[in-house]
Regions:
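General beta-strand structural signal in soluble alpha/beta enzymes
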Residues: 12, 35-40, 87, 113
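Ordered, amphipathic secondary-structure segments that act as subunit-interaction surfaces
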Residues: 4-14, 19-22
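Class I SAM-dependent methyltransferase SAM-binding "motif I" and its flanking Rossmann-like core
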Residues: 21, 25-81
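A contiguous loop/helix-start segment that scaffolds small-molecule binding in enzyme catalytic cores
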Residues: 3-8, 84, 88-117
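Alpha-helix capping/helix-boundary segments
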Residues: 15-16, 43, 93
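Short amphipathic alpha-helix with an adjacent loop that forms part of the alpha/beta core around
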Residues: 1-3, 77
C-alpha cells in the first residue's frame, strides 16, 4: 500500500457484498477507487443451484419495492418472464410474498423457495 492510497474493505454477514443488499451503494465507482471482489457465499447462486430449475438463463430480481404501484408493476413484469427468477424476501414477509406470487403468477408457475434466516 502506498502512502495516501485509499483502501476500502467491505465485509458482509449477509452474502456477497454488493449483490442485492444495501451495501451496493457503498461501492467505490463514483470515487474511481478500484474494487477487487473476493467471492464468498452468495444466496442467488446457492438458491439457483439448489432449486433444480433451469440455470441456463435466470433473472435476479433482488428485493421488491415495499409497497404501492412500483411493487405491483415489478411483479406484473415478472409474471411475463419465462426465465427462472430469484427474489430476495425478508423472513417476516415470506408467507405474504408467497401468497402474492401465487395470485399474480398463477397456479401453473412453479414457486420454489429457500428460507434463509
Amino acid at each position: 500500500m502506498k502512502q495516501g492510497e485509499v483502501v476500502v474493505l467491505l465485509i458482509s454477514d449477509a452474502g456477497t457484498p454488493g449483490i442485492g443488499g444495501p451495501d451496493a451503494e457503498l461501492l467505490c465507482m463514483d470515487e474511481n477507487i478500484p474494487v477487487t471482489p473476493i467471492p464468498g457465499p452468495c444466496g442467488v447462486v446457492s438458491a439457483l443451484s439448489a432449486s433444480g430449475l433451469a440455470t441456463n438463463e435466470y433473472t435476479f430480481v433482488g428485493f421488491l419495492p415495499r409497497h404501492g404501484p412500483s411493487r405491483k408493476e415489478r411483479l406484473m413484469a415478472s409474471a411475463n418472464e419465462a426465465r427462472t427468477q430469484i427474489f430476495y424476501v425478508l423472513p417476516h414477509k415470506f408467507s405474504q410474498s408467497l401468497k402474492e406470487f401465487s395470485s399474480l403468477f398463477g397456479v401453473s408457475r412453479y414457486i420454489w423457495h429457500i428460507l434463509i434466516v
